[in-house]
Amino acid sequence: MAYATGITFASRSILPICSRTFLSPLRVASLLVFPEKSSATFFRRVQVPHLFSTSTTTLFSSVKCSIHSTSSPETENQAVFRPNVVDILEERGLLESITSENLRSACSDPKVAPLRVYCGFDPTAESLHLGNLLGIIVLSWFQRCGHQAVGLIGGATGRVGDPSGKSLERPELDADTLEKNIAGITKIIIKILGSNPSPGGSYVIFNNYDWWKDMTMLDFLNKVGRFARVGTMMAKESVKKRLESEQGMSYTEFTYQLLQAYDFLHLFKNEGINVQIGGSDQWGNITAGTDLIRKILQAEEAAYGLTFPLLLKNDGTKFGKSEDGAIWLSPSMLSPYKFYQYFFSVPDVDVIRFLKTLTFLSLDEIKILEDQMSKPGYVPNTAQIKLAEEVTRFVHGEEGLKEAIKATEALRPGAETKLDWNLIERIAEDIPSCSLPIDRVSGLSIVDLSVSAGLFESKSAARRMLKQGGFYMNNERVDDENKRVDEEDIVEGRGLVLSAGKKNKVVVRIS
């Protein structure tokens, strides 16, 4: 059984701390929940060089690590108290279904070893998105309650595509794209689960391509196919919806649930992983796994499934999409500033619910914020600021949060922060921009410039905004519609920022 207490990227190498050793369940529990009390325990780091020059599909199977421990019989017999993570998830609106109530009791039973809980992520893009974040948050809750979090990268299943919640078959990805996506997603999981504090501090990552790459069709039919019933597979909601649609369903997609079921069987049998989590649309795939474990291993009530609700807005639409597309978790695909702004813009009707599901703030603290929102002295967006700060910190760390706050303050109309070109260049990736020659900008009326830059559709619209007091240049309000741009208005001779109200902005570069 492999236990990892942290993995971090170091340039082109990866430093794991894990173990493949024989410890009693209670000893493992004490290591996971109270690592600081195990002063006699030490870890040997093994460096795996050239992370991106080797196949990421075999990266984690090649890692060999050790835990050396000098435990006494007394410490092995110590019971460990753990908060009941299922109760916590239920209180915060993060619990949809569980396969057995025995999972709830196992979560806090001091006589039961810590659970090993996994969530799967197919590498369909180079980054995870906001829809995947709930899975990481639930994993982190298990981590914080003393259990081990496991991320499963779908290096094999990503080549097939999960039909759950999809109206069309996913496009096929080539090997190079898959490798790139696997590396990107792995890096995100490591950054988030490795950077945030937890009592166990424990997580590990697997890639299911490691056990699928050598399996033949005959092996699959013998090991999995003969235990599957077509009627049961047809009854899955994800299958029924697709079969009723005009597009139908390919055989490849139809067998996806068996691939995911075998993943659970393999992890349960070989790694001692006994809980699978996923969104509510994964219920059919998860129960296919628990059924397969029961049939093949005759293991009753030994493997569990847990689902959480999909992230929805108050109007029932999915939360996690913007006008520009998905809300990515990778800073290279969506800056921390833009990520922060998305949560800052959450309406009042949704913000308290999202504070419960997307942050680790105590429910008491959230209740205080909720009560304040209905009082006369409440400062608008206080709850949204807290939500944006907490989620941005969890995903991008303290540095990412600082970057987001700095950019937000610098772009706030009327802000006293002096704009510099380096800051403007960074935020220009997240807001509309245009390039104009100096002879077209210098001496041009501010109204004409705003139309040429695309901030307004017409001069009359620009004048209306100006009269309403919502027209800004470099965060300074423009009151005179006859104002013309001079050299002092151009930041470091390279550009300027025009704003219409709080949200609509454009960067004008001087070419």
From Swiss-Prot:
Q: Which key words are in the record? A: Aminoacyl-tRNA synthetase, ATP-binding, Chloroplast, Ligase, Mitochondrion, Nucleotide-binding, Plastid, Protein biosynthesis, RNA-binding, Transit peptide
Q: What SMART domains has UniProt attached to this entry?
A: S4
Task: Please give the chief subcellular localization of this protein.
Answer: plastid
Q: Provide the reaction this enzyme catalyses.
A: tRNA(Tyr) + L-tyrosine + ATP = L-tyrosyl-tRNA(Tyr) + AMP + diphosphate + H(+)
Which Pfam families would you find in this protein's record?
Answer: SYY_C-terminal, tRNA-synt_1b
Is DNA damage among the key words of this record?
no
Tell me the null mutant phenotype. Embryo defective. Developmental arrest of the embryo at the preglobular stage.
Q: What is its EC number?
A: 6.1.1.1
Which residue numbers does the motif 'KMSKS' region cover? 318-322
- Any single GO CC term annotated in Swiss-Prot or TrEMBL for this entry: chloroplast stroma
**Binding locations of L-tyrosine:** Y118, D162, Y256, Q260, D263, Q282
Q: Where is this motif: 'HIGH' region?
A: 123-132
Gene Ontology BP term (one): embryo development ending in seed dormancy
List GO molecular-function terms, semicolon-separated: ATP binding; RNA binding; tyrosine-tRNA ligase activity
| InterPro entries hit by this protein | aa-tRNA-synth_I_CS (IPR001412), aa-tRNA-synth_Ic (IPR002305), Rossmann-like_a/b/a_fold (IPR014729), S4_RNA-bd (IPR002942), S4_RNA-bd_sf (IPR036986), SYY-like_C (IPR054608), Tyr-tRNA-ligase (IPR002307), Tyr-tRNA-ligase_bac-type (IPR024088)
Provide the S4 RNA-binding domain boundaries.
Answer: 444-510
Q: Which residues of the sequence carry a binding annotation for ATP?
A: D122, K321
From the Swiss-Prot or TrEMBL record, state where the protein is found: Plastid, Chloroplast; Mitochondrion
Q: Keyword RNA-binding: yes or no?
A: yes
Q: Which family does it belong to?
A: Belongs to the class-I aminoacyl-tRNA synthetase family.
As for what it does, the entry says: Catalyzes the attachment of tyrosine to tRNA(Tyr) in a two-step reaction: tyrosine is first activated by ATP to form Tyr-AMP and then transferred to the acceptor end of tRNA(Tyr).
Q: What is this protein called?
A: Tyrosine--tRNA ligase, chloroplastic/mitochondrial
Q: Which organism is it from?
A: Arabidopsis thaliana
Q: Which gene encodes it?
A: EMB2768
